[in-house]
Amino acid sequence: MIMTLCIFTLTACGGSDDANAGADTEKEAMTTLVFGTSADYAPFEFMYPDENGDMVYGGIDVEVAQYIADYMGVKLQTENMSFSNLLTALNKGQFDIVLADIEATDERKEAADFSDPYLTEPAPHFLVKKENADQYKTYADFEGKTIGAQTATTKLKIISEIPNVNAVSLQSVLDLIKEVSYGKVDAILVDGSVAQQYQETNDDLVALTFDELGSSAEVCVAVAKGDPKGLLPKINEAIAKLTEENKIEEFKANAAALADVLQEVSAPEEDSEA
């Protein structure tokens, strides 16, 4: 009876080891890391024409994702969709990771798990037309104005709390840029780095920030809730390495070098309603 029990125990343990080994093999068998983003948010993620005229992905987050894939020894596959759908698609298994200048807020932590931060983002900035910039000396000057922000972002929540504001929510930052450039909204609110990028590439826009908009935020990589593929340890190792190598500054410089190309791509087209 004792011998039978021992044999059963050993068999059960062996089966468990085999199962764990199989799970480890499955993780190790990953050959492609699928990266989800919303490529309309320079300098983090955007599309631009390469030397052959083909549209390709560029930006800080794109380079971080490639660095992580290289560290893991796998290929990177980029998938583009609207920002508001990214975390839902992530949990449906459409992506392995999401990078889109995402702050790991408490609300988002309910929908996904997050890596260690790889970048600190300046406080949000308003973008307004240069000819109107003198109207906005204080945060209170935005009360009662029509202000746009990207759908499902913390910026939309911020503008919704401004007294008597008419908040406009759009999926695309490029559409927001057109709205403020054409005077269809008084201002838009975006992340600090994004505002600075568009100010540099659009002569008619000015970036403004105020203490009421808060302080800096930490930007992280998102994985599906519970990290079912066990990706976070390797991702955090890669982030530690790129931080040690000061790669973010290199990636920022690379994005800035594309400013002229980006200006041609992102500049609003003239239309009859302008």
Regions from the PLM with identified roles:
Residues A39-A42, M55-D70, H125-V173, G192-V194:
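Bilobed "Venus flytrap"/periplasmic-binding protein-like clamshell domains
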Residues G15-A21, T154-V168, V206-D211, I239-A274:
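Ligand-binding clefts/hinges and TM-proximal coupling segments of bilobed small-molecule sensing domains
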Residues G14, V62-Y71, K130-N132, T151-T153, ...:
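Extended ligand-binding regions for polar small-molecule ligands
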Residues V62, K75-D141, V206, E212-L213:
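Acidic, polar ligand-binding/catalytic clefts
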Residues A39, T120-V128, Q196-I239, A259-E273:
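Periplasmic-binding protein-like
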Residues F8-A12:
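C-terminal motif of bacterial Sec signal peptides marking the signal peptidase cleavage site
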